[in-house]
Amino acid sequence: MSLSDQVLAVNDDLPIRTDKPVHSGKVRSVYWLTEEDSRRLIKEKGYNVAPDAPLAIMVISDRISAFDCIWHGEGDLKGIPGKGAALNAISNHWFQLFKDNGLADSHILDIPHPFVWIVQKAKPVMIEAICRQYITGSMWRAYTQGEREFCGITLPERLEKDEQLAELLLTPSTKGILKGIDGVPEVDDVNITRKNIEDNYDKFNFSCIEDIATYEKLLKEGFAVIAKALNKIDQIFVDTKFEFGYVEDAQGNEKLIYMDEVGTPDSSRIWDTKAYRSGHIIENSKEGFRQFLLNHFPEPDILLNKNRMEERFALAEENALPLEAMMDLSKTYLDIAAKITGAPITLSDNPKAEIIKVLKEEYQLVD
């Protein structure tokens, strides 16, 4: 079995029964179930949702996205071995810990396979809920260029790279391109202030203005739970991105929940504590891969400048990355997942065949 066989690169061509187009994102694909199948599964599996709640199958891939591009490696390697299973395992672990600590629910109802979630359809809040405990990444780059105002927050002078901030900073951005909002540019992932959100809460899909404080509370609480757990395994939770949405429970009550993934190496920066104390940064997240790309290509501005997207897409399409870099990233994902969950990630020989088998035999979702 070759490495490329073990990688699930294409995840939007599964024969899952659906009557809607498959939504294919950078990493995950979503198959909306028919109304009949949704009702049947809710009844058969006893999911705690309304009887008519729309359900979906969410399938993660092993594709690697960075700087808004999908990258590939030598030997026709179209993804990172173990990445999808590692990300799902980490999210599953944190969502369970959130539940144990009395935080909000997630959109996940069932986990048929390490690559698969059965989820309840949610109305997404159109915000990338980002928070930062250290100054690094894009915030540091902006700071070195003289910027001191960040999402309406004024940063103090004389901060140093990778320094711990005095408090957890909430630095939200838009989820996608939002149009017709005063003071918010119509570009992807643009930073916004709390006042932007307050003045336009309905356009960000909040049901009421009070829910802004609720999302902030859930963001801070979720960050604290993960940071505490990571501290126990000598890891630092540097910064992260959460996403939120609304669902209805079995009684028809609307509630704000966590959705997408949480606390993963894709959505967060995680540093090794011992290395940080000795003045070094060891990345246990995708950030190490981003740094590799910036050093690998002679003109890193292509990866950072949003006005050069066509060049960037060509760079990703035309360049097979060294196998060593792909496998180093695989080890990062597998190692941090094992540390967080306490169990090793088992690589599948043929994930696509396994997914089809379980959805056909145990869920009757494949004809």
From Swiss-Prot:
Catalytic activity, reaction form: 5-amino-1-(5-phospho-D-ribosyl)imidazole-4-carboxylate + L-aspartate + ATP = (2S)-2-[5-amino-1-(5-phospho-beta-D-ribosyl)imidazole-4-carboxamido]succinate + ADP + phosphate + 2 H(+)
Domain of life according to the entry: Bacteria
Keyword list, A-Z: ATP-binding, Ligase, Nucleotide-binding, Purine biosynthesis
CC per GO annotation: cytoplasm
Pathway noted in the entry: Purine metabolism; IMP biosynthesis via de novo pathway; 5-amino-1-(5-phospho-D-ribosyl)imidazole-4-carboxamide from 5-amino-1-(5-phospho-D-ribosyl)imidazole-4-carboxylate: step 1/2
Transmembrane segments: none
GO BP of this protein: 'de novo' IMP biosynthetic process
Gene3D superfamilies: ATP-grasp fold, B domain, Phosphorylase Kinase, domain 1
Pfam families documented for this protein: SAICAR_synt
GO MF entry, a single one: ATP binding
EC class name: ligase
Protein EC: 6.3.2.6
InterPro entries membership: SAICAR_synt/ADE2_N (IPR028923), SAICAR_synthase_Vibrio-typ (IPR014106)
Family (UniProt): Belongs to the SAICAR synthetase family.
PANTHER family per record: PHOSPHORIBOSYLAMINOIMIDAZOLE-SUCCINOCARBOXAMIDE SYNTHASE
HAMAP family named among the record's database cross-references: SAICAR_synth (MF_00137)
Protein name, entry field: Phosphoribosylaminoimidazole-succinocarboxamide synthase
Name of the gene encoding the protein in the UniProt record: purC
